[in-house]
Amino acid sequence: MCLRELDLNGLRIKTPAIVASLGADAERVASRAESEGADIIEVRLDLLADPDVIRDIRSTVSLPLIATNRIASEGGSFRGSEERRISILRDASRFSDIIDIELMAPGRDMLLKNISCPALISYHDFSGVPDNLKSIIEDAMRAGADLVKIAVTPHSMQEALAILRILLDVDCPLCIIGMGAVGRHLRAVAPLYGSLLTYGYVTGPTAPGQMSVRELDTALRCLGAR
């Protein structure tokens, strides 16, 4: 499989790309992520004691940065007001290449109006796989997504297969992730079907079923996707 290049408003990324999702120890391990095979770094602002750390990370790594301040209802740790959460993301956009905002976030449209970098609009379901995934993807694109991220939790191989079929059927910049025990293999396999990104960890998982960056790099190389 040949790498494809994704162009997000001038930001060029070779795909499938491995995103290192970094939490509380982001500043300490950011430089290590690249050496282990990451192509992009996600800074989970909701897991940081001080979200301003992202500016220090920006000065120490050359990889593109995704800023995420995950809302509690979608698996995140941010506990403040939505206004404050959006304000943190807006400030972080000055040091980021991509901003992640949830499709269902009350402050989504306000944020999108106030950032100039590409927007990754995300949707998470930690309990299953909704029947209307295609509609959710379409809603995200209509909302202004430059890239759509869908993270769902299949409970059977049939559901996992249905997720892969969506990657073949939908024509938009899309990342699909399988969470949980049944969905774990999709983190390595979905890129073969067109998922542009896959997320891994450096020191510890930030989502159910997440593999390490090193494991993903090895798996994708074995499968001919890198």
Swiss-Prot record:
Native organism taxonomy: Archaea, Methanobacteriati, Methanobacteriota, Stenosarchaea group, Methanomicrobia
Superkingdom in the source lineage: Archaea
UniProt xrefs under InterPro entries: Aldolase_TIM (IPR013785), DHquinase_I (IPR001381), Type-I_3-dehydroquinase (IPR050146)
Reactions mediated catalytically: 3-dehydroquinate = 3-dehydroshikimate + H2O
Name of the encoding gene: aroD
E.C. number: 4.2.1.10
Molecular-function GO terms, alphabetical: 3-dehydroquinate dehydratase activity
GO biological process: 3,4-dihydroxybenzoate biosynthetic process; amino acid biosynthetic process; aromatic amino acid family biosynthetic process; chorismate biosynthetic process
Protein name per UniProt: 3-dehydroquinate dehydratase
Recorded family membership: Belongs to the type-I 3-dehydroquinase family.
Residues that bind 3-dehydroquinate: 21, 42-44, 70, 187, 206, 210
